Structure formats: structure tokens, C-alpha cells
């Protein structure tokens, strides 16, 4: 069940503010980001290394829909590498997800989950589904 409480919108708004300060920002969904990394790792190691370096050093990395990807052992390792390299480089990161912390521990390794719990501030979005509210509003107006 996918609900929309504005996580993507808020993440993008934060990214816009960081860009205005002259910093670099990269936004991508977890499924696209991880599948591209996996593709490069197999087909073009130079591109893989360039992308890994970029993900380690961009001022703000925003990963949306975390947990929506088809999670494999290789992808779990990539997530851990991204988090570790960003922590080492003291770079900020936003992860948005519909998963609970329990889900993250179940789906990912304890190492990934413990880094997220230990290194990130968690915010829970509650309320009405924004997409449903907008659809209802449009039906009433139209």
C-alpha cells in the first residue's frame, strides 16, 4: 500500500534550498539508482567507479522510495557502501521510504539498518494521503 504524505515533495524542496546555497544535490529513486549502479558494475566499471565517487561526494544525496527496489544481496552491499562513503566524507543524505524501521531490519542487513538508525534522524509522516486529497478536490471542482 503506497501512501503519499509529501515525502518526495519535501525532499525536493530541501534539495532546492541547498542548490540555492551553491551546493550540489543529486536526487534519484532507490530502484533507478541501484539498478543503474548494478548495470554499470557489470557493463562499464569505469562508469561504475565514476558514479560511486559522485555519490560519495555530492553535497546532498536524496534517495527516494527506499525499499521499493527489488532488494538483492548486491544492492544491499551498494546501499551500505553509499552510506559508509558519505559518512566518511561527512556528506548529507536524505532517504525517504514507506518502510518502518522493523521492515528495514527485515529487508536489509543489520549493518545497513543499524547505520540508518544510528546515523540518520527519522521523521514519521502521518495524515491524509495527499494524492487522494488532490483527486477528491479535483472531482469536487470539476
Report residues per predicted region.
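Loop/turn-to-beta-strand initiation segments
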Residues: 22-24, 57-61, 89-95
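Short, catalytically relevant binding-site loops at active-site mouths
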Residues: 3-5, 32-35
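General small-molecule cofactor/ligand-binding pocket signal
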Residues: 26-28, 123
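Conserved alpha-helical scaffold flanking the Walker A/P-loop in AAA+ ATPase domains
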Residues: 17, 36-61, 77-85
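Conserved Walker B
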Residues: 30, 58, 65-67
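Walker A/P-loop
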Residues: 1-26
Amino acid at each position: 500500500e503506497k501512501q503519499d504524505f509529501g515525502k518526495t515533495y519535501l525532499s525536493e524542496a530541501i534539495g532546492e534550498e541547498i542548490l540555492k546555497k551553491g551546493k550540489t544535490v543529486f536526487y534519484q529513486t532507490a530502484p533507478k539508482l541501484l539498478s543503474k549502479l548494478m548495470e554499470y558494475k557489470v557493463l562499464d566499471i569505469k562508469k561504475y567507479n565514476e558514479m560511486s565517487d559522485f555519490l560519495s561526494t555530492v553535497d546532498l544525496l536524496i534517495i527516494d522510495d527506499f525499499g521499493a527496489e527489488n532488494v538483492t544481496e548486491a544492492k544491499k552491499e551498494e546501499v551500505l557502501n553509499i552510506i559508509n562513503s558519505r559518512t566518511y566524507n561527512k556528506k548529507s543524505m536524505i532517504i525517504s521510504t514507506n518502510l518502518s524501521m522493523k521492515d528495514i531490519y527485515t529487508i536489509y542487513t543489520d549493518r545497513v539498518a543499524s547505520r540508518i538508525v544510528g546515523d540518520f534522524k527519522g521523521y514519521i509522516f502521518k495524515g491524509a494521503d495527499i494524492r487522494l486529497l488532490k483527486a477528491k478536490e479535483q472531482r469536487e471542482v470539476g
